[in-house]
């Protein structure tokens, strides 16, 4: 996956070492990045303790929101794959006590949503 895939919304796998360094200022001491995916400018990061969603905002991307979700708080998740005429896949994550999904991410038609689902299943089950 390359630059064009990123622009089109296809998630690409990132180096865990690079993400570990980039997020060092918000990671706990000893916390380790297990897997990371990039979606345009946003990141979906799985550590050994939590899920971190990084939302880079604005034209320059300097304004950044870090959403931290402990794995124990994830009550369920769903993956809706793209169909023949529907070009988008969608990942939804619910947290304990919430009726609506706390997270909803759109993906273009590609296989990376399956990789993200596998990691999410491994850490939540």
Swiss-Prot record:
Cysteine disulfide partners in this protein: none
Highest taxon above the source species: Bacteria
Signal peptide from the UniProt entry: none
Protein name (record): Uncharacterized protein YjqA
Species this protein is from: Bacillus subtilis (strain 168)
């Amino acid at each position: 996956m390359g630059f064009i895939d990123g622009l089109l919304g296809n998630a690409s796998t990132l180096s865990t070492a690079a993400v570990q360094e980039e997020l060092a200022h918000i990671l706990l001491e000893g916390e380790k990045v297990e897997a990371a995916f990039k979606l345009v400018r946003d990141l979906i990061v799985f550590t050994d303790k939590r899920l971190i969603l990084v939302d880079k905002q604005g034209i320059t991307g300097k304004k950044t929101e870090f959403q931290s979700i402990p794995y124990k708080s994830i009550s369920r998740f769903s993956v809706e794959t793209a169909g023949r005429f529907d070009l988008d896949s969608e990942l939804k994550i619910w947290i304990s006590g919430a009726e609506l999904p706390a997270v909803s991410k759109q993906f273009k038609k590609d296989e990376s949503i399956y990789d993200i689902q596998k990691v999410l299943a491994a850490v939540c089950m």
